[in-house]
Amino acid sequence: MGLDMYLTGDKFVPEYQDKFPRAKVDSYPVESQRLKMGYWRKHWALHNYIEANYNDGESLGKVELGPISLREIADAVEQGKLPDADYRGEIDAYHKEPDQVAATVKTLRDAADWLEKDDNTWKTVEYYGSW
């Protein structure tokens, strides 16, 4: 068994937006979309950091993250401030590789930028870890 980690974005288009009519699927208007923004496998250090610093204890693995939180997490990843995961050496080392660090930082910062984009929609970003 392993840890699968998802960063998703939900985008809701208000019905009153005449300039931005809702798309249709099977002739029904689409009021929201779920976007796959990021995925990690067995990145225990990142998971433990998010759970320790951003989970209110009641979310059962789901944590809503705002732009400030996403940037704080990206900074912690970039600066090597995640706690040691002590999961398995080769997996923990993989997530510390420069290209993996850069990809994680980019994913988190892109999600923060997406939240702040003013496009007359309502948006949320959620982290979810499943094991």
What residues fall within each predicted segment?
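Acidic (Asp/Glu-rich) sequence patches and key acidic residues
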Residues: 1-124, 128-131
